[in-house]
Amino acid sequence: GSLYERLKTESADEVDVMVVLQFGKKEIIQCDAGIPGFVLLKATETSLLQKYIDADGYIIPEKLRAKWFRGLVDKAVNDIKEKYSGSELELSVHDHGPAVQVDITDVSCGKKLSADLVPTFQLSPTDYYVAKHYKGKSPSSCDYSLLWRQSFSLKEKARLQDMDKEDQGCRHELLRIVKTIMRAETNFAKLTSYHLKTVFLHYNSDSRLQWSPDMLGKRFIEYMEMLYEALAQNWLSHFWLQESVNLFDDIPSKTLENMANRMRKILDNDKERRKVLKYEGKRNSVL
């Protein structure tokens, strides 16, 4: 997530962690689900995962998380509590959607770190599948509760983590500014960090762009224009799966229209732009 990609805009208090389960092809068969970016995973007859399948042999994400993965996390947390009894750190475990959340609280100061642990199957050196719910509208005859989503987190981390290293550019700065603006503007509440990151990946794929710090203002406007176009067209293509997946699929068209209108107002009105660019003294560098 943002912490590992150096895109966090405030102190880190939440992290997502993929917990990789390496079973291999002898225990798991990958099956087409008819939905781009999602698969069905079938346990072989000799697989240890037979306890977590449906009548057709497909691994049920919620069953695996609730009956096995949650137990592993509980045991690990209890072992840590026993080993470090008397510590000022308190650990608690909760269910959080498809993840198991571990809260780590420093009782001496009240600070808390929440870690979402997501069970993940690695089926090849580059293919990872996570237990994340499907929220789209693609027609399919399969049971959505059986779907596993392909994760591109490691590819995204590789692209984003050190992207300013060679030219000391302003890419990270641009994304941090945009994320802060979107968080402060209630109009853009439906835009997630992943939406903003995806627009950036599309924008940054143009190798002709100059990213020296003095270009921050121009890059900001161009990025916002690309985001506006996506909102106005009700379509944001997945960076890795391209046109086969629209990341705005689960956002109502009226909401997208309202966000596009607000974005247009920010881009066309200097006063509105100054109002939203109150970002830790960075306003002048992007005007």
Q: What feature does the model see in each segment?
A:
Residues 1-287:
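Non-catalytic helical "accessory" subdomain of NTase-fold nucleotidyltransferases
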